């Protein structure tokens, strides 16, 4: 009886080739997952920046409208959806700042406002499930609201 060592070597080659393939596929999967996660985080930041820019521009336009005597003004700003947990977001309006508070602390941001209007700015809005935010000037106050004003 003669032993065939070539057959055993071939089988070992198949096993090592398979294991090398599994290793390469695992590394590729982890690499793709990292790319996808980084892209999603970048898109979140860009969407939040665009939302904050749109809101601050609407507030500045409302400041201008507040200078007209006996006027009321409302502007709807659409909130772009993000992958972040928006139920953790709170938007606050002060006389000189628009502030986004993230309860997790990762996406906190703020925008400076000119504060040129003589009207006080107020409003705190929870962003859970929000599609649009209203910037309203009525009765001498500029505010953020979720519901369309009825004036």
Regions found by a protein language model. Give the residues of each.
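N-terminal leader/signal peptides at the extreme start of proteins
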Residues: 1-6
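C-terminal juxtamembrane segment of a hydrophobic transmembrane alpha-helix
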Residues: 10, 14-39
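N-terminal export/assembly leader peptides and their processing motifs that target proteins to secretory
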Residues: 29-151
